[in-house]
Amino acid sequence: MAASSSSAASFFGVRQDDQSHLLPPNSSAAAPPPPPPHHQAPLPPLEAPPQKKKRNQPRTPNSDAEVIALSPKTLMATNRFICEVCNKGFQREQNLQLHRRGHNLPWKLKQKSTKEVKRKVYLCPEPSCVHHDPSRALGDLTGIKKHYYRKHGEKKWKCDKCSKRYAVQSDWKAHSKTCGTKEYRCDCGTLFSRRDSFITHRAFCDALAQESARHPTSLTSLPSHHFPYGQNTNNSNNNASSMILGLSHMGAPQNLDHQPGDVLRLGSGGGGGGAASRSSSDLIAANASGYFMQEQNPSFHDQQDHHHHHQQGFLAGNNNIKQSPMSFQQNLMQFSHDNHNSAPSNVFNLSFLSGNNGVTSATSNPNAAAAAAVSSGNLMISNHYDGENAVGGGGEGSTGLFPNNLMSSADRISSGSVPSLFSSSMQSPNSAPHMSATALLQKAAQMGSTSSNNNNGSNTNNNNNASSILRSFGSGIYGENESNLQDLMNSFSNPGATGNVNGVDSPFGSYGGVNKGLSADKQSMTRDFLGVGQIVKSMSGSGGFQQQQQQQQQQQQQQQHGNSRERVGSSSDSADRSSMNVNTGGGPASTSPPYGIHHASF
């Protein structure tokens, strides 16, 4: 130890006598022997810091001190000594004596005596005051007066700058000289002109900072499902696009294997994380421009040949707003044939609320593979990321109507399945057999036709567009399941539920926010929440639903033509008969009412 210490000292050029006082006191045994006493400088004794002297400490009064207790009226009197000639008052007796000299009255000034003057102390007349005790009496008449004014009197003087009041005029004058000239700045940036206000505010800020240090509430500590649209709040495009769907805090944690098998499955059980896990910032692309999509591959068949393409769905796109209606519909109708994670192949597998657990569904449901070969896993939405643990489609972006990772994050609340928007049933994919697309469309049309009669001949109020969308995805998701299904099905058979966006036919109906071209004769009371009514009607190869609709329209047209022909024929017959009556003179000619209704007798 000594050798290492000496070597270190020689290396750094420190002498041995200078190194001795650097060692701790408990290492004296290992330290080298101290130098001779004449080399040590005596350390100065540590002086304790002087204690602050307290003012007006309680003490035993002098036995010879005169204790004077004045009344409040006497203390507050401004003129105690009054001249008997002119009734002028003075505060001091000396001033009165000098005044008497002007009246040629005998006057006498107090002379300083060589004898020791008896000390006087004054008590505060307020019983609750600490200076009411003789041991705390004040030894100055002016001091006791100012004390009584400040603590127990009325504050008559007011500062014009800060509105602070003072009871003593001298205090008010001193404050007026410094008010507004000095500023007190807090660490938070607040400025104060008064020191007392600054001290109070700074104490509050310090307490708040300590409380915040004990309980941090930063935004990064919150779960990511509180921000379903990503945490880039400075991007105006993300802010505008995030208003499209107000989806937050939907669903409770359920079993990962449970997936709803409804006709319109708006979200199913998602995995808790895996190879295809993505943050919620992938929901909306940075260049997303509202309802319009990018126009990269206008051909649908070319779209199928690309396995690694960008998001071209409803919410992902560039700033290319001006698109043709055909390209707009093609972008909406794009779905890939490479969807290997065989989720339940429902008609509208709208899993934009949460991803499906593609691993369990692919391994436990053998019918899903066959159904996926017919409908490519789903009819409208491609489920490339249809789960956090998806097997296939990991390299592709979403090309469906909505990106599948709308609610995906590491802390997503949809660790289980989310309740469906149109049904509250939570069932396993194996609980019900899969139906074909044609059968499901026919079933949906039958369910929608039951409530379509109540919605004829009325328009949708444009002011309720945004609120109805939010209600449909928010508060109404649990209480209006069945009615929402029927209302959405009604939009399939409603030809007037499409809007017009700057000359482009929008399939979102009256919920696009710009449906200015709707007329009163169109049936727009049905609520097309997802805008799939026009898309389904324009789909090719959708089974017997389109043919059935065309047949119904043809039958209605034939009935209308038949009725018009009968009316024309009956009106012509009535005209001939009336002319015959006039020519033959067989009675007064009867005028034929419209639609061939006769009242003439032959």
Swiss-Prot record:
Q: Which BP terms does GO give this entry?
A: positive regulation of DNA-templated transcription; regulation of DNA-templated transcription
Residues reported in the UniProt entry to bind Zn(2+) 1: 159, 162, 175, 179
Q: In which tissues is it expressed?
A: Highly expressed in leaf tissues.
- At the top level of its lineage, which domain of life is listed? Eukaryota
Q: Does the keyword Hydrolase apply?
A: no
Per UniProt, Zn(2+) 2 binds at 186, 188, 201, 205
Q: Which GO terms describe its molecular function?
A: DNA-binding transcription factor activity; sequence-specific DNA binding; transcription cis-regulatory region binding; zinc ion binding
Q: Where are the zinc fingers (CCHC-type)?
A: 184-207
Stretches of Low complexity bias are at: 1-10, 21-30, 448-467, 546-560, 570-579
Extent of the transit peptide: 1-50
Q: Which InterPro entries match?
A: C2CH-3rd_BIRD-IDD, C2CH-4th_BIRD-IDD, C2H2-2nd_BIRD-IDD, IDD1-16, Znf_C2H2_sf, Znf_C2H2_type
Q: Specify the protein name.
A: Protein indeterminate-domain 5, chloroplastic
